Amino acid sequence: MQKTTLLHEGKAKKVFLTGDSDLVIQEFKDDATAFNNKKKGTIADKGVVNNAISCKLFTMLESHGVKTHLVEKLSERDMLCRRLDIIKVEVVVRNIAAGSLVKRYGFAEGTVLDKPIVEFYLKDDDLDDPLMNESHAVALGVATLEELSVLRDRAEAINVVLKEFFAQRKLKLVDFKLEFGRYHNEILLGDEISPDTCRFWDLDTNEKMDKDRFRFDLGGVEDAYGEVQRRVLEQD
């Protein structure tokens, strides 16, 4: 399968059309951004690492009955995907208080939540991806109540699977972002699952092993991404 026209370029990936109108190729870049594009940089081989991790996790989730956009891994940086009509809702699942949850509500960082929190954000860079509820999403026309219910249920189910998977690899899944899209009357999981979209802390030391190392200039970014990749793929 070959790339044809560039369909979309985002902060971390490019999406290309192919000869099949139902399929696209997602190419992972090394570009890194934070704080809604206010901080920019590069993480060496990030695209290679995130593609490998995402392909592994999508395949694992498929084995648990979660339908995703992954068709196959084409190369180190390229993933063949079903072409989705992306729902403009970012779904964030939080297991441990960190990031904006701490800033917005005053949780102490590291507080283990009694029950995971599921949040919806409007996928709109110009508006800085604002937090929204179901009523906002429906009023904006980005999703129906029925679709939002599916997104919430799917995100909670994915969280159960991912938490167990990462715990077996000595990683705490602090929180993560998911994106979904419509595909022939189905809703599929899209985008990626990687240290760009998840917060991972080492199970024993609570060392941050994700994009927070880039956000807050903690150093060792490439090493952290590589270590997550090693643990995710260690049983392959």
Swiss-Prot record:
Biological or metabolic pathway of the protein: Purine metabolism; IMP biosynthesis via de novo pathway; 5-amino-1-(5-phospho-D-ribosyl)imidazole-4-carboxamide from 5-amino-1-(5-phospho-D-ribosyl)imidazole-4-carboxylate: step 1/2
Any single Pfam family the record assigns to this protein: SAICAR_synt
Sample GO molecular function, one term: ATP binding
Keywords for the protein's UniProt record, in alphabetical order: ATP-binding, Ligase, Nucleotide-binding, Purine biosynthesis
Enzyme type, top EC level: ligase
Signal peptide location: none
Domain of life: Bacteria
Annotated GO biological process: 'de novo' IMP biosynthetic process; cobalamin biosynthetic process
EC number(s) stated in the UniProt entry for this protein: 6.3.2.6
Disulphide connectivity of cysteines: none
Catalyses which reaction(s): 5-amino-1-(5-phospho-D-ribosyl)imidazole-4-carboxylate + L-aspartate + ATP = (2S)-2-[5-amino-1-(5-phospho-beta-D-ribosyl)imidazole-4-carboxamido]succinate + ADP + phosphate + 2 H(+)
Family: Belongs to the SAICAR synthetase family.
NCBIfam families, A to Z: purC (TIGR00081)
Protein name: Phosphoribosylaminoimidazole-succinocarboxamide synthase
Organism: Chlorobium limicola (strain DSM 245 / NBRC 103803 / 6330)
Classification lineage: Bacteria, Pseudomonadati, Chlorobiota, Chlorobiia, Chlorobiales
